[in-house]
Each structure stands twice: as structure tokens, then as C-alpha cells.
Regions:
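Catalytic domains of carbohydrate-active enzymes, especially glycoside hydrolases
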Residues: 1
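Preference for extracellular/luminal or secreted protein segments
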Residues: 122-123, 142-256
Length: 256
């Protein structure tokens, strides 16, 4: 799940180092590269947390963040990486529990039709699978009932980790009977999910053989790849007293 959040808030307790950085352009480039790597390996790429969880000081696992950004700000910062990823052919999108576009009402984006249907699928023309973030998170579950129904009505296709499943299913069935949600809408979502499953070969691929899995993964090639990735990922922010590069002749221990 490539994280497309632009982390411009140093007090962010939940995104922080999960983000590729504070530059929307850099984040977009890294998300696209990550997504393409996953897709090339036969893995569905799902970017998150739409429409952007980078400038918050609240963890939506525990509470609902309060955001009141202008649309111009959203377009230039938060939405930029997501827009670029969509243009590059991203397959999946996870919507976060953030009250964007409807901050005064406190409606999480994951349950907002303005965000999921109007902004993501209509305006930004995203045609892939739309996931909610985990529905057991306090940012969405604390003061809400019939969360799954609201998510489906908003335009989400897949609902992650719902609570009170029996009650949620009953609420959806009642909504279909009352005309608040149609069978056709549910069928469309199911077809989307099955289409991606077939495209990924999940109807044919056997289960992973667990015996000897560690040896098949931990090869000389993968160890070398991990080493090179680590080398390329390190960035020097300051070099006090010219400690770097390390000199094995004068020092024995280095703490990074």
C-alpha cells in the first residue's frame, strides 16, 4: 500500500516516517514507482490515505482529526500525489477517516459521498477499487452507527475490518428493502472486486507452499537488494565534526 500522504506536519503521530516526504512531487514519483513495482509482481497496489493524512496531529486510529483546508490547498498539496498516481493507472485507493470537504459536519472522508463519489470517482476519474480504512478505528467508529451502509452509499467498494458485522449486514439489507441502496449498486461493486481477482489470477493460483518459504525468500539476491536499497535510502542531513565518512582506523563503534 504506497503511502501518498505528504507529511508536512512534524507532529504527525501516525504517518510520519511512513510518508515519502514533504514534497508533493517527490511523494508522487515514489508512489508511482512503488505501485508499478507491485503491479509488475502481480500485486494489487492500493494507495492511501485519500485525500491526505499528512498534515494532522491526531491519529485517526484513536480519534477523528480536524481539518479545514481550502480546496486550492488540497489540490496543490494533499491531492497532488493521488492525482498523479491515478493518471499513472493506480489500481486501488484507500480512503481515510478525515473530515475533508465536510469539516463542519465532521463526516469522515471514508463515509462522505462528496469525497468518494463526487471527488475521487467522478472529478478525478478513478476507476479502480475503493477501500475504506479500517472501520474499527475510533476516527470513524466512535460516534457512528450503520457505518458499512454509509460507506457503500458514499461509493466505497470494499469495507475493511468492520465491527458489529451482524448489525451492519442487517442495516444494509434493510436499506436495500427501503430503496436507500440498490441491489444493482452492490452487484456493480462485487463485479469490480471479481474483475480484479481474475485479472490477478487469484482464481487459478495455488496457495503458497509454506515449507521452505524462508529459504526461497532469503536468497543472496534479495539480501544484496536489501543492502543496496538501504545504501540508496540513507540521506545525510548534517555532518558535525566531519564524522562521515566513517574511519575504521580511528573509531570502533558508530551509532546511526
Amino acid at each position: 500500500a504506497p503511502v501518498a500522504d505528504v507529511n508536512i506536519n512534524p507532529k504527525n503521530p501516525v504517518i510520519n516516517t511512513r510518508s515519502f516526504g514533504e514534497s508533493p512531487v517527490n511523494v508522487a514519483d515514489k508512489v508511482i514507482a512503488y505501485a508499478r513495482g507491485l503491479e509488475d509482481g502481480g500485486v494489487l497496489s492500493v494507495s492511501k490515505h485519500f485525500p491526505g493524512h499528512g498534515d494532522t496531529d491526531v491519529d485517526s486510529h484513536h480519534s477523528l482529526p480536524k481539518l479545514s483546508f481550502s480546496r486550492a490547498r488540497l489540490d496543490s498539496v494533499e491531492l497532488y500525489p493521488f492525482r498523479k498516481a491515478i493518471q499513472a493507472g493506480l489500481s486501488g485507493m484507500m480512503v481515510g477517516h478525515l473530515p475533508v470537504l465536510e469539516p463542519k459536519r465532521g463526516v469522515p472522508s471514508s463515509l462522505s459521498r462528496k469525497v468518494v463519489h463526487d471527488l475521487l470517482t467522478q472529478e478525478m476519474q478513478f476507476k479502480g477499487l475503493v477501500f475504506t480504512d479500517a472501520l474499527a478505528m475510533k476516527g470513524v467508529s466512535a460516534n457512528n452507527t450503520s457505518i458499512c451502509l454509509q460507506a457503500l452509499q458514499a461509493g466505497d467498494d470494499l469495507l475493511l475490518v468492520p465491527r458489529r458485522i451482524k448489525e451492519e449486514v442487517e442495516a444494509i439489507l434493510d436499506a436495500v428493502k427501503n430503496g436507500e441502496l440498490t441491489e444493482a449498486e452492490i452487484e456493480t461493486k462485487c463485479r469490480k472486486v471479481l474483475t480484479y481477482k481474475y485479472a490477478l489470477g487469484l482464481s487459478k493460483k495455488p496457495f503458497v507452499r509454506l515449507s521452505g518459504l524462508g529459504n526461497r525468500i532469503n536468497t543472496a539476491h534479495t539480501r544484496d537488494l536489501i543492502r543496496r536499497l538501504n545504501q540508496e535510502a540513507i540521506t545525510v542531513l548534517r555532518n558535525k565534526n566531519n564524522v562521515l565518512p566513517l574511519d575504521a582506523d580511528t573509531r570502533e563503534v558508530a551509532v546511526l
